[in-house]
Design a protein with these regions (language model features):
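Aromatic-Pro/Gly-enriched surface loop or interdomain linker
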Residues: 24-81, 85-88
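Low-complexity, compositionally biased segments
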Residues: 8-10, 116-117
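Sec-dependent N-terminal signal peptides
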Residues: 10-21
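Short alpha-beta junction capping motif
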Residues: 29, 81-119
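Acidic/proline-rich low-complexity IDRs
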Residues: 1-2, 15-17, 46
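N-terminal secretory signal peptides that target proteins for export/translocation
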Residues: 1-9
Length: 119
């Protein structure tokens, strides 16, 4: 008698469907611009390198350009992968904190790179 692990089958099916959905959509990365502390523009080669890696190693269709976005911009919600970097103490206004929190709660992803100094 063949025993089938339903959970394993469901998990594999979910991964297959999720991969198909992600690879069918255009994907981009947006660098967060901020004015409080730090330097949001640090390490300018980091995102092009990440974009090249994703493009070379996966089937994800990623846009070959870096977007720069302010947390208070309406266009924030068009970007689901956010990138934050800088040196020093980064500070956000209450409005920026609220916007970032809401966006993350709606499913966005934040990649924070300490760039050797974020606290």
């Amino acid at each position: 008698m063949l025993l089938i692990n339903r959970h394993k089958i469901y998990r594999q099916f979910f991964i297959l469907i999720l991969t198909s959905i992600i690879s069918a959509q255009d994907f981009n990365i947006a660098r967060i611009q901020y004015s409080g502390g730090g330097d949001w523009y640090a390490d300018p080669s980091s995102l092009p390198n990440l974009i090249d890696f994703i493009s070379d190693k996966t089937n994800i269709k990623i846009e070959n350009s870096e977007y720069k976005i302010k947390l208070t911009s309406e266009s924030l919600y068009g970007h689901t992968f956010l990138y934050l970097t800088g040196h020093g103490n980064i500070r956000f206004s209450d409005e920026e904190i609220g916007a970032l929190r809401n966006h993350l709660l709606k499913g966005a992803f934040l990649h924070a790179d300490d760039n050797y100094g974020m606290h």
